[in-house]
């Protein structure tokens, strides 16, 4: 079976757990022996692991015809896309998108992040999905989270192939119930068009059924997992450099993750003992607020903000920690606690 999969992140360039989950899932699918996956991301860098899947960059897929020669295409897309694929995709441009801003190859520019023009990028990504769906052979469409639901819907409408949407979280989780109506509408549209829905936990399944009014028969829970650690990771030493106990939060520093509770709890602990240090590893829109909160509680000298961490950095932090804390107010299925448990 061939799957056309849409996702917003893929390692090593990730911004959260979505890319990590996508990597593990596609790796597991490839291990079944009868699955071939083509994974579409907004902006590939060329250093992604392609040993078990194909990667197509939405930002390398033409939506406007440009008369460019082979050598130029090869140089511009070096390490990301073969010229043959570029020309094949160009032959499947299905409408006039010349009124939209594109580059010298007739492609949209994508940040691949979560910027202020995110809705514009989501729309452009869905346009690209139409070009790819017309040119690629596949049996099923798989869309990860709301950002790629419009792309999945478009691919289904063009080809009639079945659509599976994979719900890693809903806006009820991300917003503490203060739902963004635009995001909610995109989520609802994706679920309504889906032939089947995968959720990462029974909690998320209940949310999908109750809040999005989906038929329970078409919603299945498939839990996340982690890959067994390599011996080199297991052998990482504890490099904390202090005798103090270390308590760690690792995740997106956002409203959903309850990061302010971690800071407040740290302040209460430090009222009783001073031989503890606290690490807040990650990044997000509440990071500056958490730095200010730590200063207001006069605990900045015991608090360490590392910024975003990935790969081996994550395991180095866990190896140097005594306690991992997950104060999330809503957690569909956290991958970080599994990674922490792997480190003991």
Residue ranges of model-derived segments:
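Short glycine/serine-rich donor-binding loops of glycosyltransferases
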Residues: 334-337
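Short alpha-helical donor nucleotide-sugar binding micro-motif in glycosyltransferases
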Residues: 308-309, 316-321
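Conserved donor-binding/catalytic core segment of Leloir-type glycosyltransferases
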Residues: 198, 241-266, 279
């Amino acid at each position: 079976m061939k799957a056309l999969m849409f996702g917003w992140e893929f390692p090593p360039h990730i911004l959260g757990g979505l890319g990590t989950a996508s990597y593990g899932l596609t790796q597991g699918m490839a291990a079944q022996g009868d699955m071939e996956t083509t994974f579409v991301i907004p902006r590939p860098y060329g250093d992604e692991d392609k040993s078990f899947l194909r990667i197509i960059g939405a930002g390398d897929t033409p939506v406007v015809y440009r008369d460019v020669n082979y050598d130029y295409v090869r140089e511009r897309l070096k390490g990301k896309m073969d010229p043959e694929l570029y020309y094949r995709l160009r032959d499947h441009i299905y409408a006039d998108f010349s009124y939209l801003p594109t580059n010298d190859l007739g492609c949209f520019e994508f940040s691949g992040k979560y910027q202020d023009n995110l809705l514009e990028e989501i729309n452009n990504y869905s346009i690209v999905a139409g070009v790819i769906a017309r040119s690629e052979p596949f049996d099923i469409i798989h869309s990860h989270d709301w950002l790629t639901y419009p792309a999945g819907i478009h691919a289904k409408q063009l080809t009639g192939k079945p659509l599976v949407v994979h719900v890693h979280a809903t806006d009820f989780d991300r917003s503490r119930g203060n739902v963004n109506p635009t995001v909610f509408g995109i989520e609802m549209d994706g679920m309504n068009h889906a032939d089947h829905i995968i959720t990462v936990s029974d909690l998320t399944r209940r949310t999908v059924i109750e809040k999005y009014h989906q038929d329970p028969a078409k919603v299945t829970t498939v839990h996340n997992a982690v890959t067994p650690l390599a011996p080199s990771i297991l052998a990482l030493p504890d490099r904390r450099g202090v005798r103090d106990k270390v308590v760690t939060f690792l995740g997106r520093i956002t409203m959903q993750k309850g990061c302010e509770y971690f800071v407040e709890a740290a302040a209460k602990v430090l009222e009783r003992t001073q031989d503890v240090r606290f690490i807040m590893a990650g990044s997000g829109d509440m990071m500056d607020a958490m730095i200010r909160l730590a200063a207001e509680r006069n605990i900045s000298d015991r608090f360490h903000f590392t910024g975003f961490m990935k790969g081996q950095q994550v395991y180095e932090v866990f190896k140097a920690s005594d306690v991992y804390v997950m104060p999330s107010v809503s957690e569909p299925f956290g991958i970080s606690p599994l990674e922490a448990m792997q480190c003991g």
